[in-house]
């Protein structure tokens, strides 16, 4: 049996904070604001994983109203979501991710992001799709979005 999860997240760029995407720090003049580290990709993956096993969403597990999660590394969110899918008897088959942002260019970092996500999800890098698009005509210059679909397989 398989299950599919869909994840989405968005964060605004701000000066003075590091840019975290896929569990990595990416060199850039601005980072993504958020209650945690603002890792838009890991947040969308977390939502997709939790949704695939009908466990809720990232806000139910890590509410922004809880000071415990202020500045938290989003890797913790992925680890918790992975515990839920494993407890439900599933493993990740593959994940496909689209990042929507004007800058920085993701191409030079795509392989490192792919490897980081693969390690977190306990899959091969070839099972992780990382794509980047620009938000042409959408007036989203100061924002990054992530769209994710994940396929889970029964273990």
Curated annotation (Swiss-Prot):
Q: Which UniProt keywords apply?
A: Isoprene biosynthesis, Lyase, Metal-binding
Molecular function GO terms recorded: 2-C-methyl-D-erythritol 2,4-cyclodiphosphate synthase activity; metal ion binding
Its GO biological process annotations read: isopentenyl diphosphate biosynthetic process, methylerythritol 4-phosphate pathway; terpenoid biosynthetic process
Using the record, list the residue span of the signal peptide; answer none if the entry has no such feature: none
Query: What is catalyzed by this enzyme?
Result: 4-CDP-2-C-methyl-D-erythritol 2-phosphate = 2-C-methyl-D-erythritol 2,4-cyclic diphosphate + CMP
Q: Which domain of life is it from?
A: Bacteria
At the top of the EC hierarchy, this enzyme's class is: lyase
In the Enzyme Commission scheme, what number(s) does this protein have? Answer: 4.6.1.12
Q: State where 4-CDP-2-C-methyl-D-erythritol 2-phosphate binds.
A: 9-11, 35-36, 57-59
Binding sites annotated in the UniProt record for a divalent metal cation: 9, 11, 43
Q: State which residue ranges cross the membrane.
A: none
Pathway given for this chain reads: Isoprenoid biosynthesis; isopentenyl diphosphate biosynthesis via DXP pathway; isopentenyl diphosphate from 1-deoxy-D-xylulose 5-phosphate: step 4/6
State the InterPro entries in the record. Answer: MECDP_synthase, MECDP_synthase_CS, MECDP_synthase_sf
Known cofactor(s): a divalent metal cation
Site feature Transition state stabilizer, where: 35, 134
What is the free-text note on the cofactor? Binds 1 divalent metal cation per subunit.
Query: Entry's NCBIfam families?
Result: ispF
- Tell me the subunit arrangement: Homotrimer.
Family, similarity comment? Belongs to the IspF family.
Give the protein's function: Involved in the biosynthesis of isopentenyl diphosphate (IPP) and dimethylallyl diphosphate (DMAPP), two major building blocks of isoprenoid compounds. Catalyzes the conversion of 4-diphosphocytidyl-2-C-methyl-D-erythritol 2-phosphate (CDP-ME2P) to 2-C-methyl-D-erythritol 2,4-cyclodiphosphate (ME-CPP) with a corresponding release of cytidine 5-monophosphate (CMP).
Q: What is the name of the protein in this document?
A: 2-C-methyl-D-erythritol 2,4-cyclodiphosphate synthase
Q: Provide the species name.
A: Koribacter versatilis (strain Ellin345)
Q: What is the lineage of its organism?
A: Bacteria, Pseudomonadati, Acidobacteriota, Terriglobia, Terriglobales
The primary gene name is ispF
């Amino acid at each position: 049996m398989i299950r599919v999860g869909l994840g989405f997240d968005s964060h605004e760029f701000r000066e003075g904070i590091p840019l975290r995407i896929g569990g990595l720090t990416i060199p850039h003049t601005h980072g993504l604001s958020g209650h945690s580290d603002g890792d838009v990709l890991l947040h969308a993956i977390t939502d997709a994983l939790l949704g695939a096993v009908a466990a809720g969403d990232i806000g139910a597990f890590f509410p922004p109203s809880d000071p415990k999660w202020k500045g938290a590394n989003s890797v913790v969110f992925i680890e918790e979501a992975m515990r839920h899918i494993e407890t439900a008897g599933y493993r990740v088959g593959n994940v496909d991710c689209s990042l929507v942002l004007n800058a920085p260019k993701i191409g030079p970092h795509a392989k490192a992001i792919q490897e980081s996500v693969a390690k977190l999800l306990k899959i091969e890098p070839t099972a992780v799709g990382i794509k980047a698009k620009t938000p042409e005509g959408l007036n989203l210059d100061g924002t990054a979005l992530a769209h994710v679909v994940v396929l889970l397989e029964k273990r």
